[in-house]
Amino acid sequence: MNKKLIMVLSVSIIIVFIGYIIFDTVKPAGSVKNETKNAAIVEIPDAWKVSAEFKVNEGYLKAVAVNAAGTIYLGGDSFVSCYNKDLKLIWNVKTPSPVTSLSNFGDTVFASTMEQILVMSPAGKILNQLGPFEDSCIITSVSSNKKYVAFADAGNKMVFILDKGGEVKKMIGQNDRHFVIPSPYFEVALDNENNVFVANTGLHRIETYSIDGVLKSQFGEAGTAPGSFCGCCAPPHFALIPEGFVTAEKGINRIKILNKKGEFVEFVNSKNNFIKSVPLNLASADGKTIYGAYPADSKLYIFNRNTTP
């Protein structure tokens, strides 16, 4: 009796399994949902090209910033250099520690090390050193506007908002531990309206906060589709441009432009020989020229729109 029952159950399971296979095979294509953001990616040509490459000899290159006049600031291990728009050296300053990121507003340059923010004059003189701020601090990004300086601390998974005198006005992520930061890629950017843009890299999105730390909006998802962010922690770097954002990725080392809603616009550079795991640090003053500092070869890559068909 038990053998008959087992046989009946076995036959029933086989019939159900075969039926599922038949249904899955014959169901119309229109009923198949896009189950992955990585499926059937359409080939999209790059809309930009590398117009120049510039080898940096001052040291290991990690960061770039640029102002509206085209003045370029480069930083790394352990230096900050200033170049004019024709890549002629204006000044070079040795720093007490390796520089992890750069920002400038008006006539002031801000250079972050792992524990401090260096405040520099247009001539390269170090005017002030802000910090240290917290134990286990790993500053990965600094940004400034008319009133505030913001920096991202990957060690403590927080964003600090300072006034120009260096006083801490707000710490975002302090209580809710909201930021998921698997590796030392953690970017922040301030705009002129005091919006704070933060790359929550472990969640593959860019989040917008008020200066008081209130979450206003967010966008982004993991994947290899043009509008998604690839890699374990993405976007590792981004810069604000008038159109929206220019973002870097790793895993697939590509640079792209997203509009202010986070929607894909175009690829700046997706077909290259860059090391997959080493993203470019990005800067742009006008959205017409994009600068990428590449640590793997200590070169500055300059991108302009491709005018050829």
What are these language model-derived features?
Residues 2-309:
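Eukaryotic scaffold repeat domains enriched in small/polar residues
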